[in-house]
């Protein structure tokens, strides 16, 4: 599979906040992006193309269940090629769930769809 991973400005703002709070966040995200390039269909599908993926933050020490959530939007050019947009990231302790309607609004505001 050959999927390109891109970030949105909204994601970058939220990731910067988490990177300040958790020292290992940047390294955790790097590992996450590498795994996402290999398997973009991981996580739970919230709506067609929109997925919620659990991310463990090592410095938080709570594993995936208490870590962060990364929202992605996948556009497939074929079964083995496409783009994965990192739309949002949030700490599970700050928000318990993400509203699909708000996520769709963020995606459209970023000019992805």
Say what each PLM segment does.
Residues 1-29:
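Arg/Lys-rich, positively charged N-terminal/basic patches that mediate binding to nucleic acids
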Residues 14-18, 39, 56, 90-93:
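Alpha-helix C-capping/helix-to-loop hinge sites
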Residues 24-42:
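Compact soluble domain cores
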Residues 37-61:
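A short, surface-exposed loop/turn module that caps and links secondary-structure elements
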Residues 57-68, 72:
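Arg/Lys-rich, often Gly-containing low-complexity segments of ribosomal proteins
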Residues 68, 73-113:
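Enriched for short, Lys/Arg-rich terminal
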């Amino acid at each position: 599979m050959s999927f390109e991973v891109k970030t949105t400005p909204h994601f970058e703002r939220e990731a910067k906040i988490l990177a300040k709070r958790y020292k290992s966040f940047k390294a955790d995200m790097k590992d996450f992006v590498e795994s996402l390039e290999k398997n973009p269909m991981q996580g739970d599908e919230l709506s067609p193309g929109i997925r919620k993926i659990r991310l463990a933050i090592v410095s938080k020490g709570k594993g995936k269940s208490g870590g962060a959530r990364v929202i992605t939007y996948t556009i497939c050019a074929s079964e083995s090629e496409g783009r994965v947009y990192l739309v949002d990231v949030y700490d599970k302790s700050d928000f318990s769930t993400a509203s699909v309607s708000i996520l769709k609004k963020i995606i459209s505001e970023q000019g992805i769809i």
